[in-house]
Curated annotation (Swiss-Prot):
GO molecular function: actin filament binding
GO cellular component term, pick one: side of membrane
Stated name of the protein: Ponticulin-like protein C1
UniProt main location, coarse: membrane
Gene name, Swiss-Prot/TrEMBL: ponC1
Coiled-coil annotated residue ranges, if any: none
Carbohydrate-modified residues: N118
Keyword ATP-binding recorded: no
Record propeptide residues: 119-147
PTM per Swiss-Prot/TrEMBL: The GPI-like-anchor contains a phosphoceramide group, rather than a phosphatidyl group.
Region forming the signal peptide: 1-20
Bilayer disposition of the protein: Lipid-anchor; GPI-anchor
Membership in a protein family: Belongs to the ponticulin family.
Length: 147
């Protein structure tokens, strides 16, 4: 009986935490360099897509096993297809939605844009509310199991 309760508790905890996680596949990037073409206008980068942005060739790659950690890569201007090793890179985490990412001699401001899982969702706070709902349901179930 104790094993069954423990197993149920584990399943509920995993389910609640997995539903609260946000995923990202788009990033708005600006550059601190005054000569950059994207100082005032953010450029939107997509995951795993090489793009000419901020005067450089950039791409963002997810870190295996994480929905919020990414490697931000900068390539030489001549390497338009990102076929070679990046000239510089830096791993960053989307925590508060915004990160300063220094790669090479440049510091980029990266705004992580949460994926929309449902067209009726208006912003990232919806996914937070969904996660909170699952957490509440999990605590109710836990209290029932304790009785």
């Amino acid at each position: 009986m104790k094993f069954t309760k423990s197993l149920l508790l584990l399943i509920v905890a995993v389910f609640a935490s997995s539903n609260a996680a946000e995923t990202f596949s788009n990033f708005q990037v600006t550059n601190s360099d005054a000569n950059s073409p994207c100082v005032t206008t953010p450029v939107e980068l997509k995951v795993n897509t090489c793009q000419s942005a901020c005067g450089s060739i950039l791409n963002v790659l997810p870190v295996t096993g994480s929905t919020s950690k990414f490697t931000f890569n900068q390539f030489g201007a001549q390497d338009t297809k990102c076929a070679a090793t990046p000239t510089s890179s830096n791993e960053f985490t989307c925590v508060d939605g915004k990160s300063k990412v220094a790669i090479g001699t440049t510091t980029y401001s990266v705004v992580c844009v949460p994926d929309k899982t449902n067209s009726s969702e208006s912003d990232s706070s919806d996914s937070t509310r969904i996660g909170a709902s699952f957490a509440l349901a999990a605590s109710v179930l836990l209290s029932m199991l304790a009785i």
